[in-house]
A protein has these predicted regions:
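Glycine-rich anion-binding loops of enzyme active sites
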Residues: 1-51
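Glycine-/charge-enriched secondary-structure boundary and capping motifs
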Residues: 5-12, 63-65, 69-81, 85-156
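Generic alpha-helical propensity signal that fires on short helical segments
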Residues: 11-12, 28-32, 49, 55-58, ...
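Glycine-rich beta-alpha junction loops
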Residues: 18-21, 41-47, 54-57, 84, ...
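Acidic, glycine-rich loop-and-beta core segments that form the ion-binding/anion-interacting portion
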Residues: 31-78
């Protein structure tokens, strides 16, 4: 990651692998117009967009120990370093209690606009998303304003 690791530094990462019965594999091919799309709330940046964040912070010379402008009482650094929410408990509970779930999309780098289409069985299927139907974590609003980021880019 340019600008982050110096010679002799390293990154430690991990992953997990799951096992599922073939008949329970997702996405299913029966996704169709009119299906309901449900989103689980993010608690912040998770692990995405930090190259952009670093650029904004460096350009604007931001003191990360200052409080956020959202009156939450949290500092900028507390927002930026908030641990990634892991959704496995919620997802497993949903899958256990409903046989109507046709797909799950992991919204990572690329955001909603690049990840959601991966679950659709063909290009005739799409999604209408009302962006005002949920409260976006304040760190996104703050970064968008500070970095003059357009609406499409902030969705990534």
């Amino acid at each position: 990651m340019p600008g982050l690791y110096e010679k002799g530094h390293f990154d430690l990462a991990g992953f997990s692998v799951g096992v599922v019965e073939r008949n329970k594999l997702l996405p299913k091919q029966n996704i169709e117009k009119g299906d309901l799309l449900i989103g689980l709330p993010s608690n912040g940046l998770h692990s995405n967009g930090y190259s952009l964040v670093r650029n904004i912070m460096n350009q604007k010379n931001i003191n990360v120990s200052l409080p956020m402008s959202d009156k939450s009482g949290e500092t900028i650094v507390e927002n930026l370093l908030r641990p990634t929410k892991i959704y496995v408990k919620e997802i497993l509970e949903l899958l256990k209690n409903s046989d109507g779930i046709k797909a799950i999309s992991n919204i990572t780098g690329g955001g909603i606009t690049e990840n959601l289409p991966r679950i659709f069985p063909n290009s005739n299927i799409g999604a209408k998303i009302n962006l005002s139907s949920w409260k976006r974590p304040s760190i996104f609003n703050w970064l968008q304003e500070l970095g003059n980021i357009d609406d499409q880019e902030i969705l990534k």
